[in-house]
Design a protein with these regions (language model features):
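Phosphate/pyrophosphate-binding active-site segments
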Residues: 42, 175, 224-228, 343-444, ...
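Glycine-rich phosphate/diphosphate-binding loops that line cofactor/substrate pockets in enzymes
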Residues: 49-59, 100-105, 129, 187-192, ...
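Glycine-rich, acidic loop regions that bind phosphate or pyrophosphate groups
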Residues: 139-180, 200-202, 289-397
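A short, small-residue-rich loop immediately preceding and capping a beta-strand
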Residues: 60-64, 82-85, 103-142, 258-261, ...
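Conformationally flexible catalytic loops at phosphate/diphosphate-handling active centers
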Residues: 187-251, 410-412, 616
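Active-site diphosphate/adenylate-binding microenvironment
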Residues: 50, 65, 73, 399-477, ...
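Thiamine diphosphate
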Residues: 138, 146-153, 313, 357-359, ...
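Glycine-rich, anion-gripping cofactor-binding loops and their flanking helix/strand elements
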Residues: 102, 261-347, 448, 458-488, ...
Length: 625
């Protein structure tokens, strides 16, 4: 996507967006200055204008850490109603903004300085880009005259973030700030959501420099649209494609609704349920879509994929029609691609035309917003039914699915007296002891998969995780952001000991800001998922995966950071610890659950294998195969 030309150090960006999300032409200048008498025009510095623009966009909270190049923007925050959450590491600011966006649907905002601060937010930007999270990131930059001189804390932020943002821009004129901010929020939240970065040189926001003076204005919606002539996301499905999809659905004997995170981004959970019930079609929800369809619904099959349950994986594999809604046929779902759902025709709905046919060629591709397309599909199906078209007999398919569910439920071997604690047991007890609308935030690894498997997600926007990038260290800061966004909800971060050690310092942020998140560490003293692969595929050659159950002492570490620290080592201690944590609501709580390091995540489709080769728990017979 295009951006306005900057100094030669930052070359012009080529069009790369996954949904034609930006501008191929240089960004236009802002709207004409107000025609009111000059004495009544509001004169602001660039820093004041930036904060005022955020206020006008409805920003109530932002996450960040000040530094030299961004200091002029931090000064007007003192006089702003915007709440600023001071993080301990810039990566934490980005993940907090992600967590906030996940649970609210509003763009998360983070702000950091130049150089190493900007590079520290690259991981959250990439994470948000892969999971289509609306984010607006503001970075400081050295003065325009210093760009290209290797000045202190200078880096090519635009170049570095080009491939991990939906749009990025170096602002070179303070008069451009209001329009740039409006564009950023518009691009981040429309079409396929994603992160947008604004790089702000110090001299255009510093009130001590004449070059930062600007005359305040606020662009209208029409002016914003006119400034983005190449950006027109398609939201409604093509009528011909809608009709073809409806006809396929009415003919299918083994259909499955394959639901991805795009359904949640489109706020389409209610429409999805109406479609599933109208057509009596079973639903699988990917890792990014958990909660889009209630797990307690009779048509819910749960999560597919590498660690999905047997029924979800096998129903997709043996279907004759996959109705893919906001999903991208990720390799973790398809397994070996040429063996994936070999008899299935595909209807693929996505807001991003680049996703259609990227992995699996659909018989019916539909570009559009998932909610609008689902509503159009429902109407088209009703019209066909009114004309006398009936669904075929699917009783045999339903009986087959019921047989799989009965034969291959999620299971694990319970701990014998005196044995180590099972992580699945911890999650079951935690699930049953918390409100149904509890927000669960996971890191990456075994604990992430167990959380998605054993929690029952009956409400949308109650599951937050790093799906595409798989970012260790995501859970704690993202949970803090989620709690800021939904202070009325209980928020539990489920983390592994490896993940926790990467970003645990943000619990100091939570304690200082009185953000009472709760953290369950499933501490198996290993990098658990890596250990599992080494055991299963590398002849039990455990290379560099052992951590230690006692270094650090998580209970003492939590207390040192201003949290309540608890430790649980046996099954009979679990309920009391969870109850105590749930009763504390004035500061963060961390529970160190000492779990069995030998426990593995099942089911599992080995990497590179077709989904037919799914491995279930060995207790279910046939050696787990």
């Amino acid at each position: 996507m295009g951006r306005c030309p900057g100094p030669a150090r930052f070359p012009r960006r080529s069009h790369h967006s996954r949904e034609s999300a930006g501008r191929d032409a240089p960004r236009r200048q802002g709207p004409p200055h107000p025609t009111t008498p000059r004495s009544t025009v509001m004169q602001l510095s660039g820093g004041q204008a930036l904060i005022k623009a955020l206020e006008m966009e409805g920003v109530e909270v932002m996450f960040g850490l000040p530094g030299g190049a961004i200091l002029p923007v931090y000064d007007p925050i003192i006089d702003s109603p915007i709440r600023h959450v001071l993080v301990r590491h810039e990566q934490g600011a980005g993940h907090m903004a992600e967590g906030f966006a996940h649970v609210t649907g509003r763009p998360g905002v983070c702000m950091v300085t130049s150089g190493p601060a900007a590079t520290n937010v690259v991981t959250p930007l990439c994470d948000a880009y892969m999971d289509s999270i609306p984010l607006v990131c503001i970075t400081g930059q050295v003065p325009l005259s210093a760009i290209g001189t290797d000045a202190f804390q200078e880096c090519d932020t635009i170049g570095i973030t080009r491939s991990v943002t939906k749009h990025n821009e170096l602002i070179t004129d303070p008069q451009d700030i209001p329009l740039a901010v409006r564009q950023a929020f518009h691009l981040a939240t429309t079409g396929r959501p994603g992160p947008v970065l604004l790089d702000v040189p110090k001299d255009i926001v510093d009130p001590t420099r004449p070059s930062s003076a600007m005359e305040w204005y606020w662009p209208s919606d029409d002016e914003v649209a006119a400034s983005l002539p190449g950006y027109r996301p398609t939201t409604k499905g093509h009528p011909k494609m809608i009709r073809q999809a409806a006809e396929l659905i009415l003919r299918a004997r083994r259909p499955v609704l394959y639901v991805g995170g795009g359904v949640l981004k489109a706020r389409a959970a209610e429409a999805l349920r109406e479609l599933a019930e109208l057509c009596d079609i079973h639903v699988v929800t990917t890792l990014m879509a958990r909660g889009a369809f209630p797990d307690d619904h009779r048509l819910a099959l749960g999560m597919p994929g590498m660690h999905g349950n047997y029924t979800a994986v096998t129903s997709m594999q043996q279907s004759d029609l996959l109705i893919a809604l906001g999903s991208r046929f990720d390799d973790r779902v398809t397994g070996k691609l040429d063996g994936f759902a070999p008899d299935a025709k595909v209807i693929h709905v996505d807001i991003d035309p680049a996703e259609l046919g990227k992995v699996r060629r659909p018989e019916v591709p539909i570009v559009g917003d998932c909610r609008l397309v689902i509503e159009e599909l429902i109407q088209a199906i009703r019209d066909l039914m009114a004309d006398g078209v009936e669904f075929p007999d699917r009783l045999g398919w339903k009986q087959t699915i019921s047989g799989w569910q009965e034969k291959y439920p999620l299971t694990y071997e319970q701990s014998e007296p005196g044995e180590a604690l099972k992580p699945q047991f911890v999650l079951e007890r935690l699930r049953d002891a918390t409100p149904d609308d509890t927000i669960v935030v996971a890191g990456v690894g075994q604990h992430q998969m167990w959380s998605s498997q054993y929690w029952r997600f009956n409400h949308p926007y109650t599951w937050v995780n790093s799906g595409g990038l798989g970012t260790m260290g995501f859970a704690v800061p993202a949970a803090i952001g989620a709690k800021v966004g939904r202070p009325d909800r209980t928020v539990w971060a489920v983390d592994g000991d490896g993940c926790f050690q990467m970003t645990a310092q943000e619990l100091v942020t939570a304690a200082s800001e009185r953000i009472p998140v709760k953290v369950a560490i499933l501490n198996n003293a290993y990098l658990g998922m890596v250990r599992q692969w080494q055991e299963m595929f590398y002849d039990e050659r455990y290379s560099e995966v052992y951590l230690s159950p006692d270094l650090p002492d998580y209970r003492l570490w939590a207390e040192a950071m201003g949290c309540v620290g608890l430790r649980v080592e046996s099954p009979d201690e679990v309920d009391a610890a969870i109850q105590k944590a749930n009763e504390i609501d004035d500061r963060p709580v961390v529970i160190d659950f000492r779990t069995d390091s030998r426990e593995k995540v099942y089911p599992m489709v080995p990497s590179g294998a077709p989904n037919d080769q799914i491995i279930v728990d060995p207790s279910q017979g046939e050696g787990g195969h």
